[in-house]
Amino acid sequence: MREEEKKTSQVKKLQQFFRKRWVFPAIYLVSAAVILTAVLWYQSVSNDEVKDQLADNGGNSAYDNNDDAVEVGKSMENVAMPVVDSENVSVVKKFYETDAAKEEKEAALVTYNNTYSLSKGIDLAEKDGKDFDVSASLSGTVVKAEKDPVLGYVVEVEHADGLSTVYQSLSEVSVEQGDKVKQNQVIGKSGKNLYSEDSGNHVHFEIRKDGVAMNPLNFMDKPVSSIEKAATQETEESIQQSSEKKDGSTEKGTEEKSGEKKDDSTDKSGSKESSTTEDTEQS
């Protein structure tokens, strides 16, 4: 009986305890404090692990990895005329296009040492024949800056993805091999050369993609990506033309062989008829 009375008394005390207004709020606060402490502890441990990993990687995060970084500014450049003052400069010799009119083809020929050559770029000159500042058409690295006895001073600037620009017939240069140049930066002055004397005081400008000359006038004020697209298109067209020529040659050869077989069978048939006729006459 006493044990039952003790249990009953304990239950009543608990009931009285929980009936107090501050009990449940206190329980909630304690629970929240425990949960918050656990969360903060977990975050602290996670941050320590991340710091350890960064320390192992030399302190570099994924955003610090510049190996795959894209030079957005350069890729967004448009091809510019290689002159500081383009208003007073005009094209005096164009790029030789195989599908151009006869007159345009003749005008795009270069005569040197009694030999005709195809113009692989454009010649730019001022109307009054004076020299002018030549600037970089695109940003890049100077891979060549030297004097040629026939072409004058030559500067070649290398860009990304097999693209390069060439500047010839310069009277002087203001850059050296290995220099980094920005678009529209002055790299030299126009001049005269022996290779294209009829162009007078000029600069010869070329755009090359993987060593192949492209018509600069097709890309002026257009993004660099347009050169890549044009080069890809030309390659595809060249492959298609080669394939068509190959198919045409195969068909022609097949027709010739078929004709030979037909002629041979005709000859054999004629021989048989002739033999039959002779046998009949002898009879």
UniProtKB/Swiss-Prot annotation:
Quaternary structure? Answer: Interacts with SpoIIIAH and SpoIIE.
Q: Which UniProt keywords apply?
A: Membrane, Sporulation, Transmembrane, Transmembrane helix
Kindly list the places in or outside the cell where this protein is found, as annotated in its UniProt entry.
Answer: Forespore membrane
Any matching Pfam family: Peptidase_M23
Query: What broad class describes the main subcellular location of this protein?
Result: membrane
Question: Which Gene3D superfamilies does the UniProt record give?
Answer: Glucose Permease (Domain IIA)
Give the Basic and acidic residues compositional bias ranges: 243-271
Q: Give the membrane topology.
A: Single-pass membrane protein
One Gene Ontology cellular component term attached to this UniProt record is:
endospore-forming forespore
Using the UniProt annotation, give all residue ranges assigned to the region (Disordered): 228-283
Physiological role: Involved in forespore engulfment and required for anchoring membrane proteins on the forespore side of the septal membrane. Forms a channel with SpoIIIAH that is open on the forespore end and closed (or gated) on the mother cell end. This allows sigma-E-directed gene expression in the mother-cell compartment of the sporangium to trigger the activation of sigma-G forespore-specific gene expression by a pathway of intercellular signaling.
Q: Which domain of life is it from?
A: Bacteria
Lineage here is: Bacteria, Bacillati, Bacillota, Bacilli, Bacillales
Q: Could you cite one Gene Ontology molecular function of this protein?
A: metalloendopeptidase activity
Any GO BP: sporulation resulting in formation of a cellular spore
Query: How is this protein named in the record?
Result: Stage II sporulation protein Q
Record field: transmembrane: 22-42
